[in-house]
Every structure is written in structure tokens, then in C-alpha cells.
């Protein structure tokens, strides 16, 4: 019998991406504290959060658990997820006209073997200079 595949995410985009593979899966969102540890670099942070999400979902379901976390690194600092619309405006203004790195940590956890398979992917982005009006219309 094949193990069930579990997506440890509430992200509609991640759900859509996995659905495009044609695999049958169950969604078991995991809510964890997503704060960076003191002096933790962005790559280790993204992988740690992805692994913690997978482990949290493994408390509810068995199988192959897929979890991911994406962060932005700007000038060696982690840019957190926006807390609200005002914060989203602040973050996009901060990124406007600058180079930054988008880092996704992926963790696949096999609950039967208690084994992780991980990968970290970096995308280098140069954002155009955006006006406040452009940023507001995007948000």
C-alpha cells in the first residue's frame, strides 16, 4: 500500500502547485512560531521552519509529508512575512529598486522511516523601482 501524501501548508499556491503534479494528497496545515533565531541565516531558517511544519503535521497524519517555507533575504537580513497591509507596503517599499534573494526551504518527511529529505532553493531577484501608487495597487 502506498503511503498517503500530506501537504503541510495552508497556502493556496502550494496546494495548486502540488495538485498540478496529478498526485492525490491531503492537506494538513501546521501552524508554528515562524520567528528566526538569533543570528540564524536565511537558508537555515527556511529549512528549519519547513522541517518544523512537517513534524507538526506528522502529529496528526502519517505518510509522506511535504512542507516548505519561503523567506526573503535583503542585505544579509531576513525580511519577515507582512503582518498586515501597512507592513506589506513597508516591505515592498524596502525591496523597491533593490536586489534580494528569495529562499525556499523544502522538507519531505517520511513518517514510517522517520527520515527527512531537504532542499534549499535560492532565486536572485532585482526589483524595479516602484512608486507608492504601484505598491498600493499591488497590495
Q: Which functions belong to the PLM regions below?
A:
Residues 2-23:
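N-terminal beta1-alpha1 ligand-phosphate binding loop
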Residues 2-4, 41-139:
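Anionic-ligand binding patches
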Residues 8-11, 30, 96:
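Short linear Ser/Thr-Pro motifs
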Residues 12, 32, 113:
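Short, glycine/serine-rich, charged loops/turns that create anion-binding
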Residues 16-20, 37, 59-60:
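Short loop/helix-cap segments at secondary-structure boundaries that form the rim of catalytic
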Residues 24-35:
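A short beta-strand-loop structural module common to alpha/beta enzyme folds
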Amino acid at each position: 500500500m502506498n503511503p498517503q501524501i500530506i501537504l503541510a501548508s495552508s497556502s493556496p499556491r502550494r496546494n495548486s502547485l502540488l495538485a498540478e503534479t496529478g498526485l492525490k494528497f491531503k492537506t494538513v496545515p501546521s501552524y508554528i512560531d515562524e520567528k528566526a533565531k538569533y543570528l540564524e541565516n536565511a537558508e537555515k531558517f527556511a529549512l528549519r521552519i519547513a522541517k518544523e511544519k512537517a513534524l507538526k503535521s506528522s502529529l496528526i497524519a502519517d505518510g509522506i509529508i511535504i512542507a516548505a517555507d519561503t523567506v526573503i533575504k535583503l542585505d544579509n537580513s531576513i525580511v519577515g512575512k507582512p503582518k498586515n497591509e501597512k507592513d506589506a507596503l513597508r516591505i515592498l517599499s524596502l525591496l523597491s529598486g533593490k536586489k534580494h534573494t528569495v529562499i525556499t526551504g523544502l522538507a519531505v518527511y517520511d513518517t514510517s522511516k522517520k527520515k527527512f529529505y531537504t532542499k534549499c532553493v535560492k532565486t536572485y531577484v532585482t526589483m524595479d523601482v516602484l512608486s507608492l501608487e504601484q505598491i498600493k495597487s499591488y497590495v
